[in-house]
A protein has these predicted regions:
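Sec-dependent N-terminal signal peptides
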Residues: 4-13
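Small beta-barrel nucleic-acid-binding modules, primarily SNase/OB-fold domains
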Residues: 15-143
Length: 143
């Protein structure tokens, strides 16, 4: 019975994976994890499922920070990308997520964050905080 309830609970999320264009939701962003990942309230999920999901911005690679950074330059760039995303979220009034698919790492979804009608993906690339990335070998941020 629990398995059936969990499956039913996840049906709204599973359905967006079939739509290549994604499904757009108005959200409350709860925190910025790094330059390309934000957490948002997912209050539509029933108990005992978590009420927060993380969305990783699809199609970009931002520098890592902390222990994942491969050099001091990447750490600094990763922190700058995170700060950029935090500032963009803080300045925005209308916050949405475009959910596209499940991420290859459990617990996250892929999509985009739309701030006042503007794609975070586009903002990160245009301002030099991210590179386009679709699963190929990543370029180093250490040069």
């Amino acid at each position: 019975m629990k398995k059936i309830l969990l499956l039913l609970a996840f049906l709204p999320l599973i359905s967006f994976a079939k739509d290549k264009n994604g499904v757009l939701y108005d959200v409350v962003i709860t925190r910025v994890k790094d330059g390309d990942t934000v957490a948002f309230q997912a209050t539509w999920l029933p108990d005992p499922l978590p009420k927060e999901l993380a969305v990783r911005v699809y199609g970009v690679d931002t520098p890592e920070k902390g222990f994942r950074a491969k050099c001091p330059q990447e750490e600094a760039r990763g922190q700058a990308a995170t700060n950029f995303t935090k500032n963009a979220v803080a300045k925005s009034i209308k916050r949405q997520v475009l959910l596209m698919d499940w991420d290859k790492f459990g617990g996250r979804v892929l999509g985009d964050v739309i701030l006042d009608g503007v794609s975070l993906r586009q903002m990160l690339i245009q301002n030099g905080f991210a590179r386009e990335y679709y699963g190929e070998t990543k370029q180093s941020w250490c040069n």
